[in-house]
Regions:
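Conserved P-loop NTPase motor core of helicases/translocases
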Residues: 2-140, 179-200
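Conserved helicase motor core of SF1/SF2 NTP-dependent helicases
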Residues: 127-146, 150-246
Length: 246
């Protein structure tokens, strides 16, 4: 199965991936499991364990593999000058020249997509998933797990939702609401776009998670019944005030 793990923030994505890695270190080491972390800058990754799984690092490994394979073919060509082997050598040479461009950003999206599709687990932020320069346009997943979904706006959530056959949303609309920079509204209106209506602003500011939670059947949602963040008396008070003592 192809699994997508996303959140609005990098730290949430990395916490999940780091937990998976620590629980399955041997499986990741022998490549029984594989993951790729999509991120614009490696410095945004919060856990050192996860930096080895960035798409750019996977690409560097792939280049070395292709280069070694090419040199093997080159050696074979010296002993076998058949037409078939010569054509194979020429195509391999073209492929090697293609992937050895100076900058990772110059690599065709088709190659990035090929690398991404070879992994079972992909981690990214909601907006990072929409980056057209990372070869994600055609990526599809069997399941998307979206953490901190209560903090994401409708556009942010729709990006991963539309990529997956099944979706698991994890969040709490009673906690932090979606974060939208107020300057965004001003910038949109300053760009000669029609003034934002109340409904437009509500779409950006109200949690899409809350909308879904209110409308889906009870059989499709559940609530955790255990917390570790606060003393029991405080937890009971919050449960009574915001969660109907559930």
């Amino acid at each position: 199965s192809k699994i997508l793990i996303v959140s609005q923030q990098n730290i949430a994505v990395d916490n999940v991936l780091n937990g998976l890695y620590n629980e399955n270190i041997e499986l990741f080491k022998d490549n029984s499991h594989s993951m790729v972390r999509i991120v614009s800058n490696e410095n945004k990754i919060q856990h050192e364990n996860i930096k080895q799984f960035t798409l750019e690092n996977w690409f560097q490994n792939y280049k070395e593999m292709v280069k070694n394979r090419f040199y093997t073919i080159e050696q074979d060509k010296r002993f076998d000058e058949s037409l078939e082997n010569s054509l194979y050598f020429d195509k391999s040479s073209e492929w090697l020249n293609l992937i050895y461009k100076d900058d990772f950003k110059d690599i065709p999206n088709e190659i990035k997509e090929l690398l991404i599709s070879s992994h079972q687990i992909l981690g990214a932020t909601c907006m990072g998933l929409a980056n057209k320069s990372l070869g994600l346009d055609l990526s599809e997943f069997d399941i998307a797990i979206i953490d901190e979904a209560g903090r994401a706006t409708a556009p942010e959530l729709l990006i991963p939702i539309l990529r997956a056959k099944k979706v698991v949303l994890i969040g709490d609309h009673n906690q932090l609401p979606p974060t939208v920079d107020k300057q965004l509204f001003k910038d949109i209106e300053d760009d000669n776009i029609d003034k934002l209506t109340f409904e437009d602003k509500e779409v950006l500011e109200k949690s899409f998670f809350e909308e879904l939670y209110e409308k889906i059947p009870n059989s499709n949602k559940m609530m955790l019944n255990e917390q570790f963040r606060m003393p029991k008396k405080i937890g009971d008070l919050i449960s009574e005030l915001f969660y109907e003592s559930m």
